[in-house]
A protein has these predicted regions:
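Glycine-rich beta-strand-centered segment in the early N-terminal region that forms part
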Residues: 22-37, 50-100, 114-115
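Glycine-rich Rossmann-fold phosphate-binding loop(s) that bind the pyrophosphate
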Residues: 77, 149, 184-187
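Adenosine-nucleotide cofactor-binding segment
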Residues: 177-178, 183-186, 194, 198-291
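Glycine-centered, small-residue-biased loops immediately flanking beta-strands
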Residues: 206, 303-304
């Protein structure tokens, strides 16, 4: 199977090349990708190259593919898997294969025929053996790509835990009908977290408070969930969850003001031995020491802080109130990615329409723009970047479609479609793009790329 793929040769050195992939053979699967969404972890891997723990040391001579938030269509199925997958079936992929002895060798870093920024991938048998190729029954490919970042949030909701006073029995997950705070929560992952908090078929809070320090981000987030932002805040209800968006930038005492949201119904508000107004569950989306300390002060009795932000500083330190750890049962957790169940549930919930991951997307482009868009992650503000792997298209902000549409009817039509959908990407926009954008042409392959073989028998 011929493919055009971005391949990583070193730090900030990726090349768009035509290659030949293996056929499915007896036990492989070949998938034609349709979409990939770019993750901040892609930026870390591409920027660091072999300096990243997950990237092999020999990529200069044996390059890997990058990108891991994918969706596509099965094109070839080996005899071993014909009872489980069929040609033409839509699928997603769990990138954390979790192969014993090879735990750090995840999709998007360590594999030569599996990545996101490519037209096709070859999946060796181990991918299916680990349960990481997942059927998808949704209506749009881009939603399946977003199942991977959504699964990280689902994992976060399941990583939090609580226990009753004087009890060793732990209740895993957020507090059902509790109070939740998202600090710096209007980025792409924060928006996904809001969606899950309001629409998850599992536990949901009764009250959700979302902070940021940028009015534009807050206004966009509020609009996506049907609220009008003005005067530094927006208040409303989403699917039975009380939701508040608030700008903390000008607050003289953010801890006091954020606790005020809970004082209306906090049974511990007048208890001098407790922290009245504190939150049951806090998710922090920025690795900033001052915010970590604020979160410490904002936890309620038995509260759980999920340090969701992945830091780059290996020596990150912050003040944390350990008096309250001892007496008020405060605790901290973190998670990096989800497992197969988190991913399978995310794919299922998106396919059934429970979740609306389109709120995360701010930019759309083609395969030709994928590498530059990855390198520009920290330079250009916005949420998720969506790549259609079989088209050529500059990475473009949805909010810029109208301006580009003045000279290009292609963007004018995309603007019309998205404007009719609250400014969000949607299935109609995807269908139009796939039918009208310039197609990627795959040339003569420079080499046949074979994947290394890892078997479960070697565990």
């Amino acid at each position: 199977m011929k493919a055009k793929a971005w391949r990583l040769y070193g730090a900030r050195d990726a090349r768009l090349e035509d290659v030949e992939l293996e056929s499915a053979g007896d036990d492989g699967v070949v998938v034609e990708l349709v979409t990939n969404t770019i993750c901040l972890s892609d930026y870390k891997g591409v920027s660091l190259g072999t300096g990243h723990k997950r990237v092999p040391k020999d990529i200069a001579t044996r390059p890997t593919m990058f990108g891991h938030e994918v969706s596509g269509i099965v094109r070839e199925v080996g005899e071993k898997w014909k009872g489980q997958f069929q040609v033409g079936q839509r699928v997603g992929l769990q990138p954390s294969l979790n192969i014993p002895g090879h735990e750090l060798e995840t999709v998007g870093y360590a594999w030569h025929t599996i990545g996101g920024e490519t037209t096709h991938v070859y999946l060796p048998s181990i991918v299916r053996e680990m349960g990481c190729l997942l059927p998808y029954d949704g209506d749009a490919f881009f939603k399946c790509s977003l199942a991977e970042p959504i699964s990280c949030i689902v994992s976060g909701f399941r990583t939090n835990y609580h226990n009753a006073f004087c009890s060793h029995d732990l209740e895993v997950g957020i507090v059902d009908k509790g109070t939740m705070l998202l600090m710096a929560g209007c980025g792409a992952m924060g928006l996904g977290c809001i969606d899950i908090a309001c629409h998850s078929p599992e536990k949901r809070p009764r009250r959700l408070v979302v902070t940021d320090i940028d009015d534009a981000r807050l206004a966009r987030a509020a609009k996506m969930f049907g609220m009008a932002y003005a005067g530094g805040r927006a208040d409303g209800e989403v699917n039975g969850v009380e939701v508040h968006f608030v700008n903390t930038k000008g607050m003289s005492d953010p801890v006091k003001e954020l606790k005020a949201y809970n004082l209306v119904d906090d049974a511990r508000a007048d208890n001098p031995t407790s922290t009245g107004g504190g939150y049951d569950d806090i998710f922090l989306f920025a690795a900033i020491p001052a915010l970590i300390t604020q979160c410490s002060d904002l936890l309620g009795f038995g509260g759980c802080l999920n340090f969701f932000a992945g830091p780059t500083d290996q020596h990150l330190m912050a003040n944390f109130n350990f008096y309250n750890v001892h007496y008020l049962m405060h605790h901290v957790v973190a998670n990096s990615g989800g497992d197969v169940k988190d991913m399978a549930d995310s794919v299922d919930w998106i396919g059934k329409g429970y979740l609306h991951p389109e709120v995360m997307i701010t930019h759309v482009g083609g395969l030709d723009s994928a590498f530059e868009a990855t390198l520009d992650m920290l330079k250009i503000p916005g949420g998720k970047r969506l790549v259609y792997t079989h088209v050529n298209m500059p990475m473009t902000a949805i909010e810029d479609f109208a301006e580009k549409g003045k000279a290009d009817p292609f963007f004018a039509e995309l603007d019309r479609i998205c404007s009719a959908n609250k400014g969000l990407w949607c299935k109609e926009a995807e269908d139009y793009l796939l039918a009208n954008a310039p197609r990627v042409e795959i040339g003569e392959p420079k080499e046949l790329v074979r994947e290394r073989r890892i078997t479960t028998a070697a565990r």
